[in-house]
Amino acid sequence: MELQFPLFSIFFVTILFFFLFKKSSKTTKNLPPGPRKLPIIGNILELAGEVQHRVLAELSQKHGPIMHLQLAEISAIVVSSSKVAKEVLKTHDLAFSDRAQLQLSKIILKGCKDVVFNDYDDYWRQMRKICTVELLTANKVNSFRAIREDEAWNLVESIKTSLDSPVNLTHKFTSLTNAITCRAAIGERSKYQDELVHLIELMAALGGGFDIADLFPSYKFLHFLSGLRSKLEKVRKRLDDIFYNILKEHEEKRAKTKNSDGRVAGEEDLVDVLLRVQEKGGLQFPISSNNIQGIICDMLTAGTDTASTALDWAMSELVRYPSVLHKAQAEVREAFKGKTKIHEDDVQGLSYLKLVIKETLRLHPPAPLLLPKECREQCVIEGYTIPVRTKLIVNAWAIGRDPEYWVNAESFDPERFSNKSIDYNGTNLNYIPFGAGRRSCPGIAFGIATIELPLALLLYHFNWGMPGGIKPSALDMNEVLGATLKRKTNLLLSATSYTPNEDSS
């Protein structure tokens, strides 16, 4: 989650209530270095804007790979190197295993009874195990392949009907990943899909940063200033209504079709799986409807934004680097030659395509600052004392572009991953697009599967370029940091249909 701040509220609080705040005389000695703090608001103004990951990377060049920030009442450390990341994500992983609690999670997720935002405790361990053993296993991810293939083909067909004008790939990718994730989570083309997606997007937009309540948690009377709480409560009320109906429909279907082991006829969606686990019982913490709602919200938020953003950046980089685009297309077109229908199995041998995706996620990690954690026990990192409740921000974006490890770090060069055993699981701390340690993303396989086939089909079926004769190097690559790191402007590209005989002419 990024650090976006409502400046009008901050200035209002600063001016109107200045006399209420006194600088505490209780300061923790031996904190990491950092930029000078202003009274009351600390370093908030330095993080104003849309590219906090870049600002923090620049500050780290001056203050070091571990840096202290004061965000109003919140004490935070920022880690910007793989060496220090190993300390906080591996060596002292347990000490930083709690999640920073934000107003979003407290309201929308009803006290954080999900997996993403819940603190590290017995309940979290139970629910994480359910996610890894029941919801996101390789077999379960593979069971949704028909959905991914169907929606990827729908993407191709929708582009074929709009070749007369530039194709808005940003919108296409959002529709694609919304459809895949919703069908996998709540069932085949649910009538609630469109509104549910809208609410998830609204939730992500509203909760895209620290609110006054997050910055000044001790001063409850200030929390009304931004109006965020009432907006979040309205979203939660509508989510409650929708999930009540979704769960009711699933329970009715299960009552009619489930077999002796509790499984419904046909392929289970994620709600079916959670209801089956709920009915089976035997858990230390029985699963409630609220728990199911929280976990499905996690899946919808992560599953839609992460994959669509990665596809957007992948096509952006490919168009900017024509030689890479041509090589990726040559591999795909050779592999798919003569095939009338392309399946996920056909993608598994596309080694260069996989390198393209890895390189895309190096330069454009979905959550460049990962999700903020919280220190649960005092520890010493690089000789500095980190107090309990200090927030931890890991700048995965800066680590992925560290010139001390990555040669020509700013260039898009998929072949840098050739013959290197670097995976997505955070085993190499120089490459952590999905985090590392016990709080890393459990849905990596689902996300990568959602990216690979659509990207391969776009490279096979179409020739791509910039509209209006614009040079590829002129493509706007500006970013905006919301729930994920997105393009600031939609990606509009020109496309022409590819026919296999082009290669022989």
Swiss-Prot record:
Main location: membrane
One GO CC annotation: membrane
Matching InterPro entries: CYP450_71D, Cyt_P450, Cyt_P450_CS, Cyt_P450_E_grp-I, Cyt_P450_sf
Family as reported in the entry's similarity comment: Belongs to the cytochrome P450 family.
Sequence positions that bind heme: 441
Superkingdom per UniProt: Eukaryota
EC number: 1.14.-.-
Taxonomic classification: Eukaryota, Viridiplantae, Streptophyta, Embryophyta, Tracheophyta
Cofactor (UniProt): heme
Species assigned in the record: Panax ginseng (Korean ginseng)
Pfam families xref list: p450
Transmembrane segments: 1-21, 442-462
Membrane topology: Multi-pass membrane protein
Keyword Repeat set for record: no
Keywords, comma-separated and alphabetical: Heme, Iron, Membrane, Metal-binding, Monooxygenase, Oxidoreductase, Transmembrane, Transmembrane helix
Its job: Probable heme-thiolate monooxygenase.
GO molecular function: heme binding; iron ion binding; monooxygenase activity; oxidoreductase activity, acting on paired donors, with incorporation or reduction of molecular oxygen
Identification of the protein by name: Cytochrome P450 CYP71D313
Location(s) in or outside the cell: Membrane
